[in-house]
């Protein structure tokens, strides 16, 4: 698709699982400044136990995106309006826009011990887990020039634990899309 359409921007929106319910809430938006596949590497067996040895190969978005997100994250009025305009079920928390590392994997995680293991073994600063961002970043990074600028904007719909529910999926999808809309209208450069 990148080869055929040669987009200037490649943006992914959607939902993700947060890693820390004490620092983020349902619907909070996470911009993946860095992403990698948390299962990349190799599995080895040593005596009586198996171990996964990670090979972390992250992709990072352009600095301009990071600066735009930092600026928008301070715009409490815009974030409040995004939340207030949603007509469905939503949490009673203030919407936040976060940015940082997000990891991708091939399966849905509903086990907080897996999340704790990823945070311990790879980076305690990972904000979210999901299944697609790394693939998008990989494709954009290795595209034939001109490469698109790429960014993923996902919102927290659960915390990858046994309490996984769908109550806030619509709200999370909405906040993700609305933050993208705000960035696209107010920050993206369309001069070709």
Name every feature range the model reports, one short phrase each.
Residues 1-192:
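Intrinsic-disorder/coil detector with helix-boundary
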